[in-house]
């Protein structure tokens, strides 16, 4: 069952990547051929230099969500900022540059295996439409 679910998630993630492949505003994750991504969630990353004036990553999330497609602000890229790390030696003295950037630019989408092809198709259409609206020409 897990193999089937993974294949469905991978197919959904690939569909999202295909929908945005010619849109410079978002960067996809390039997975090396010798690695198999489980696609528990699917991420895209906003390239801020391509944002139209008045647009932000958070506005993209809001617009996609308003059109009925779940969209979130990504991962726990800087978990060390959580209260649990207060007063410990485990928090870095300076924020980690790459972790900060990933946290500030990530878009996270659901690709769980219970989603239908119609739902993934809608997801792709909505993402593409909103990204096109948010992207400089």
Regions found by a protein language model. Name each.
Residues 1-137:
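PLP-dependent aminotransferase class I/II
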